[in-house]
């Protein structure tokens, strides 16, 4: 039997892992200690969804989830990355791959949650983009560097295009695939907006 709730939780966990990996790897590259990497990985993992929920004035997702699994997933993922930092040290591009997965998952998830709360397409698109991009924005601000989304990358625009498709096709999977595909293409071929 198909359990939709289990699928949603699984996809959310994959997104949390991807963004926590991205944040912790960025911390490793800045020579942060394990606590710094955990804080950065966790902030990256939950940052976008937290901003979305605060703006929508709904309960913050990780404060109400079962046994704080969101925080536990982010902390554990960050510790794993810190402990395996030598494996990832020479693979700088891997941050972008994890980030692409997180962006696609959380853009769609943020859109769906916002549309459920507001029934407004415009608000849902903005909240989807914020959910997808917010964790990376928090990560970059914590590291005192220009946020990734402001550096000419096809990042927020990938989220926007995927979410526009979601409005017209009503297929979260297709929107996810489009966002991920755009990010993979831009990483692979070094495509920029400027």
Name each region found by the language model.
Residues 1-57:
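N-terminal topogenic module of multi-pass integral membrane proteins
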Residues 1-7, 54-64, 109-123, 167-173:
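Helix-coil boundary and interhelical linker segments in multi-pass alpha-helical membrane proteins
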Residues 4-16, 61-76, 120-132:
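Structural signature of hydrophobic alpha-helical transmembrane segments
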Residues 15-16, 74-78, 99-107, 156-164, ...:
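Core segments of transmembrane alpha-helices
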Residues 20-30, 79-92, 137-147, 184-194:
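C-terminal ends of transmembrane helices
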Residues 35-43, 67-72, 92-103, 127, ...:
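Cytoplasmic-side transmembrane-helix entry/capping segments in multi-pass membrane proteins
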Residues 70-113:
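Ordered, amphipathic secondary-structure segments that act as subunit-interaction surfaces
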Residues 119-133, 137-194:
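C-terminal transmembrane helix-loop-helix hairpin of multi-pass membrane proteins
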